[in-house]
């Protein structure tokens, strides 16, 4: 057996949570492989809206095993709040959610450090979510981190050492803070965490594969936020690309099967950094309003723009995407024309690739297509798609070289249309 991977191809917020929930019935296991509570996966069904930050999106399927892998960073306080909210709505987590002992813990001082570093950067700030993600991964790489497995023995000593080291750094930054409430909630989260199955996830996952179980690996954020391949330094602190599933779960490269790449019919970005197709006019505001484009974790208004095919082709390349999934098609239902960026103009030269030194000065070169101006939210099969929408899909597939297997026409799990069903 091989694992399949589901990941975002843009700057995050593509709708991965909903798609995982839609795909989950065909899998036995859903495993999260990177990131932390800085990204929220939003799911809507049966009139309820859920935002998952650390827990895999397969948790809503009652018979599925869900695994938080070693590549994830976990805040015990936020995890406790998220898990208790799910349990209160009738979902049994403790039997079905397994957590890697090798996952690193976000400490209260990591969150303080995150805020202090951003404050020190002034106008050059990256625009982090303030959840302590960067400082936690920094400690991991510098071999100073505290892991989930550490809570089982000699924990107080390791925590005290990490806290003292962080306080020395904060002293140098001259940043005022109060840990009292953060620490109280954090240690309550630690006790709650002990109630779950803490596992050697790499052994568990490979054992499940050997026993013929099907596994879906769930990524967070998006390819353009990858620490190596994103628009550095305006990126996250982990590998959001397909290779991150190997290092974040302990899966060998030859065990990767299908790679599902998710993108919106337009583009959004939260925080600072280059965004070639960003719109600063009423069209951008209209997309934001119709798409409800506000961060599920921070509540920040997302920057909006037309779909960027240059960036998408780059993401498809570095991930080895085999199947595409287009989200939020319905947001563009009322537009008379739709634009798609097919190249950039940079330093007076036209280029069709995503460059190392991309800046805000990059000018998008667009192709304009007719809009479909049809309400697609109640459509149940591709046979109902308007001619203009089919033309848009064909144009995208020709440009990107990969079939668009799934189209989302609304936020609910039922508003999902599978294409190429003859396969």
UniProtKB/Swiss-Prot annotation:
This protein's UniProt keywords: Cytoplasm, GTP-binding, Ligase, Magnesium, Metal-binding, Nucleotide-binding, Purine biosynthesis
Assembly with partners or alone: Homodimer.
Binding, GTP: 12-18, 40-42, 302, 328-330, 408-410
Binding site for substrate: 296-302
Keyword Metal-binding: yes
Family to which this protein belongs: Belongs to the adenylosuccinate synthetase family.
Molecular-function GO term, any one: GTP binding
Role: Plays an important role in the de novo pathway of purine nucleotide biosynthesis. Catalyzes the first committed step in the biosynthesis of AMP from IMP.
Binding site for IMP: 13-16, 38-41, 129, 143, 221, 236, 300
Catalytic activity, as annotated: IMP + L-aspartate + GTP = N(6)-(1,2-dicarboxyethyl)-AMP + GDP + phosphate + 2 H(+)
Highest taxon above the source species: Bacteria
Keyword GTP-binding: yes
Binding annotation for Mg(2+): 13, 40
Protein name: Adenylosuccinate synthetase
Biological processes per GO annotation: 'de novo' AMP biosynthetic process; IMP metabolic process
Subcellular location: Cytoplasm
E.C. number(s) listed in UniProt: 6.3.4.4
Manner of cofactor binding, per the entry note: Binds 1 Mg(2+) ion per subunit.
Gene Ontology CC: cytoplasm
Active site as annotated: 13 (proton acceptor), 41 (proton donor)
Family matches, as PANTHER family: ADENYLOSUCCINATE SYNTHETASE
Residues of the signal peptide: none
Pathway entry: Purine metabolism; AMP biosynthesis via de novo pathway; AMP from IMP: step 1/2
């Amino acid at each position: 057996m091989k694992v399949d991977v589901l990941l975002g191809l843009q700057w995050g917020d593509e709708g991965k949570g909903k798609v995982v929930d839609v795909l989950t019935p065909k899998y036995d296991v859903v495993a999260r492989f990177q990131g932390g509570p800085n990204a929220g996966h939003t799911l809507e069904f049966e009139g309820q809206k859920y935002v998952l930050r650390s827990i895999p999106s397969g948790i809503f399927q009652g018979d599925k095993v869900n695994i938080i892998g070693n590549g994830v960073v976990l805040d015990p306080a936020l995890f406790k709040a998220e898990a208790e909210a799910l349990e209160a709505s009738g979902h049994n987590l403790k039997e079905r959610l397994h957590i890697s002992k090798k996952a690193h813990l976000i400490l209260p001082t990591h969150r303080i450090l995150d805020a202090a570093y951003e404050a020190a950067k002034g106008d050059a700030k990256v625009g982090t979510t303030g959840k302590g993600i960067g400082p936690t991964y920094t400690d991991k790489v510098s071999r100073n981190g505290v892991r989930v497995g550490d809570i089982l023995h000699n924990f107080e000593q390791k925590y005290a050492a990490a806290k003292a080291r962080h306080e020395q750094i904060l002293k140098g930054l001259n940043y005022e803070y109060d840990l009292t409430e953060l620490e109280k909630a954090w240690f309550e989260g630690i006790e709650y965490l002990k109630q779950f199955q803490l596992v050697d996830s790499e052994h568990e996952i490979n054992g499940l594969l050997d026993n013929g179980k099907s596994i879906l690996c769930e990524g967070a954020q998006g390819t353009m936020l990858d620490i190596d391949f994103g628009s550095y330094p305006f990126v996250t602190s982990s590998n959001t690309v397909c290779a991150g599933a190997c290092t974040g779960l302990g899966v060998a490269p030859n065990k990767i099967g299908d790679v599902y790449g998710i993108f919106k019919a337009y583009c959004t970005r939260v925080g600072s950094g280059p965004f070639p197709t960003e719109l600063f006019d009423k069209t951008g505001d209209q997309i934001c309003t119709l798409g409800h484009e506000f961060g599920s974790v921070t509540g920040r208004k997302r920057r909006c723009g037309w779909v960027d095919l240059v960036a998408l082709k780059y993401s498809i390349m570095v991930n080895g995407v085999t199947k595409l999934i287009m989200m939020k098609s319905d947001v563009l239902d009322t537009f008379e024309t739709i634009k798609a960026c097919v190249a950039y103009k940079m330093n007076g030269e036209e280029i069709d690739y995503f460059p190392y030194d991309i800046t805000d000065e990059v000018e998008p070169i667009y192709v304009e297509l007719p809009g479909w101006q049809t309400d697609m939210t109640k459509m149940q099969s591709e046979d109902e798609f308007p001619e203009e929408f089919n033309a848009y899909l064909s144009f995208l597939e020709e440009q990107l070289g990969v079939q668009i297997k799934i189209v989302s026409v609304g936020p609910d799990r039922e508003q999902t249309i599978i294409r190429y069903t003859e396969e």
